[in-house]
Swiss-Prot record:
Its EC number is 3.4.24.-. Binds 1 zinc ion per subunit. Its main location: membrane. ATP binds at residues 272-279. It comes from Phytoplasma mali (strain AT). The active site is at residue 494. Its cofactor is Zn(2+). One of its GO terms (biological process) is proteolysis. This is ATP-dependent zinc metalloprotease FtsH 2. CDD domains: RecA-like_FtsH. Homohexamer.
Length: 686
């Protein structure tokens, strides 16, 4: 806001000029209006009277001149009296259909002549004008012939001169009154001036950017002294916090390390999947050390103008040196640090920006007290010169939170929310493997919104369960209704996944089965691994593929027909099988990696055929295994499908009851209670 006000005052000269120009235009219009009102004092009827008088004098003068000419034929002196209209002019004004008539007349002879009067009559209407023209014809004395070809006002005046003894007319300069037209024109001129001014100003700024003279540091968000955000505001990541404490100690006591001859790391690279808290961790380091924090994005330095990115890098580091000790945090650093010479990122602007970053981090100049932290999701794409020691010395892989960390994150985000006493964050943490911190926060926020929608003061387990489904699959499609055949097929499809999960030892545990449509899915199974591990065995991967194919196998076994509802299952199953063959070495092709991208692959076309055969072999094996398990456990499949058609959603506890007793106890009791109430009601009606 301050900057906008400053710009307004800076450019105030152009606005002052326009204001004065408009004021003068308005003043001119008002003055001309007053003059016009003064002219209006002469009534148009007066000119008619004057013209009639001219006509009479002309007639009388003509008769007298004839008489005198007879009496003084012998005299050569010409004493003929004539009537002279010195000035006679008619103008059509700016107002359509009105006229201005100006004339000056008098009588006399050639030796002596006295002027009588000069009159101006503005704004004469058409009716009066016609009457004046009629008298003018009479003054002429002869009618205007068609051969005279009079088509306009000026020709009329010329004929009056030709057919009378009037002295040649003298045109009177006249500035007509145009109303407020001059003011409107002035407004348009001012608008054009302002438009051209801003266009010129924009061109000037662009030229300054190209020349590197106008590099605004406002692109970089400088957050000074972030004491309010520290490690206490970050849950989990205990190992990363411990490693970062060394940087914090250096920022607080840099001379201690210099006295020992130790070189503090110049840069710290944080890499990992999205949403794990890389930016928050860097911000917390600055808050713990209580130093300025420069937060920028890699895209801030890339422009169409060559050299502008490098200039912004210099500007950023110069500003950081003035505020040392401090932290520069570059988010999405792969934007400016991709490997030079690669096909996708080979251009002079990218290379110049990267070279300038390399020089600033470890070049001829020293950046004492300036630590560079960067975050990326693609560490493999970074240029080797960036990741070498001396630039980014420390590399921290920020992984997805463990069960313990997820529980801590949930409790952290639950501090400002009210939950029911039966809400168990430990259980929720176990239900969310592979979730990052952002997703966990979204679950609790969504549950709070659902509770508010129900007009309750506390969040219960039902809200959290619904929020989890929303984050995973989207909101339920209540308007989407199945017919009986479709609903039965969806129930058996989801039951097929559940049977594989219950009967295959290496498969993931089933937490929930539902046939309520969400997003593009007609239903889904929520599964959890039996335990969180860093590695997956071949048996476990085959079990996952078998589980994905369980829905299609159930459709084929029960209906001898299949639907397109398994398209996403095939996608995930094929991805796992392809990785087993090309990356993990879990096929008959042996422990070899077959890598490919849009421009390169390290295997031949004949080998690609073999890879496809191996993938097909794995898929066929798992599908036959799924059909076998479904066929052997048809009774269990029918039971789960039956309850899905009735309840629509079955939990892990319900599945265990079906597996052990063949029924869901709470549902059977509820049905029995409803049947009794219905019977009692019918008896009362009888």
């Amino acid at each position: 806001m301050k900057k906008n006000i400053k710009d307004i005052f800076k450019n105030f000269n152009i606005f002052w000029f326009c204001f004065i120009f408009l004021l003068l235009s308005l003043l001119y219009c008002l003055i001309m209006m007053e003059i016009s009102h003064q002219h209006d004092n002469n009534k148009p009827s007066e000119i008619i009277a004057v013209l009639k008088e001219i006509k009479e004098l002309q007639t009388k003068s003509t008769e007298e001149s004839k008489k005198e000419s007879k009496e003084s034929k012998e005299s050569k002196e010409d004493k003929t009296k004539i009537i002279k209209i010195k000035k006679f002019d008619i103008h059509e004004t700016s107002n359509y259909g009105s006229y201005l008539i100006v004339f000056q007349w008098g009588t006399g002879n050639k030796d002596s002549f006295e002027w009588e009067k000069e009159l101006k009559f503005p704004n004469v209407d058409q009716e009066t004008y016609k009457e004046i023209m009629k008298i003018c014809f009479e003054i002429i004395g002869t009618p205007i012939d068609k051969k005279d070809n009079i088509t306009n006002l000026s020709q009329m005046i010329t004929k009056i001169k030709e057919k009378t003894n009037l002295i040649p007319l003298q045109r009177i300069p006249y500035q007509p009154y145009f109303g407020f037209a001059p003011f409107i024109s002035a407004v348009n001129i001012c608008i054009l001036i302002i438009i051209f001014y801003f266009i010129y100003n924009s061109i000037e700024k662009t030229s300054a950017q190209i020349s590197g003279k106008n590099l605004n540091i406002s692109r970089q968000k400088v957050l000074v002294n972030q004491q309010e955000f520290t490690f206490k505001d970050i849950a989990g990541a205990d190992e990363e916090k411990e490693e970062m404490s060394e940087l914090i100690n250096f920022l607080k006591n840099p001379f201690k390390y210099e006295a020992m001859g130790a070189r503090i790391p110049k840069g710290v690279l944080l890499y990992g999947p999205p949403g794990v808290g890389k930016t928050l961790l860097a911000k917390a380091v600055a808050g713990e050390a209580k130093v300025p924090f420069f937060a920028v994005s890699g895209s801030d330095f890339i422009e169409v103008y060559v050299g502008l990115g490098a200039s912004r890098i210099r500007k950023l580091f110069n500003e950081a040196k003035q505020n040392a000790p401090c932290i520069i945090f570059i988010d999405e650093i792969e934007t400016i640090s991709h490997q030079r010479g690669s096909v996708n990122y080979s251009n002079s602007e990218h290379d110049q920006t990267l070279n300038q970053l390399l020089v600033e981090m470890d070049g001829f100049t020293k950046n004492i007290g300036v630590i560079v932290m960067a975050a990326t999701n693609q560490p493999e794409s970074l240029d080797l010169a960036v990741t070498r020691p001396g630039r980014f010395d420390r590399h921290f892989h920020i992984t997805l939170p463990s069960v313990k960390d997820r529980e801590a994150i949930l409790k952290l985000h639950a501090r400002n929310k009210k939950f029911n006493d039966d809400v168990d964050f430990e259980s929720l943490a176990k239900q969310t493997p592979g979730f990052n911190g952002a997703q966990l926060e979204a679950i609790l926020n969504e549950s709070a919104l659902l509770a508010t929608r129900r007009n309750v003061l506390v969040i219960c387990n039902e809200d959290i369960s619904e929020a989890l489904d929303r984050v995973l699959m989207g909101p339920s499609k209540k308007s989407k209704k199945y017919n009986d055949k479709e609903k039965r097929m969806v129930a058996y499809h989801e039951s097929g996944h559940a049977v594989i999960g219950l009967k295959l030892p290496e498969a993931d545990q089933i937490q929930k089965v539902t046939i309520i449509p969400r997003g593009n899915a007609g239903g889904y199974n929520l599964t959890l691994p039996q335990e969180e591990t860093f590695f997956s065995s071949k048996k476990r991967l085959l079990a996952q593929i078998t589980s994905f194919l369980g829905g299609r196998a159930a459709e084929e076994v029960v209906f001898q027909d299949v639907s397109n509802g398994a398209y996403s299952d095939f996608k995930y199953a094929t991805e796992i099988a392809k990785k087993m063959v090309t990356q993990y070495g879990m096929s008959d092709l042996g422990p070899i990696q077959y890598m490919e991208n849009n421009f390169y692959k390290n295997f031949s076309d004949s080998k690609a055929v073999e890879i496809d055969k191996e993938i097909q072999k794995i898929i066929d094996y798992c599908y036959q295994n799924a059909k076998k398990i479904i066929t052997e456990n048809r009774d269990l499949l029918d039971l789960i499908s039956k309850y899905l058609l009735e309840i629509e959603t079955i939990t892990q506890k319900d599945l265990e009851e079906i597996l052990n007793t063949g029924i869901i106890e709470w549902w059977e009791k509820d049905k029995l209670k409803k049947n009794l109430q219905k019977s009692e009601k019918e008896d009362c009606n009888k």
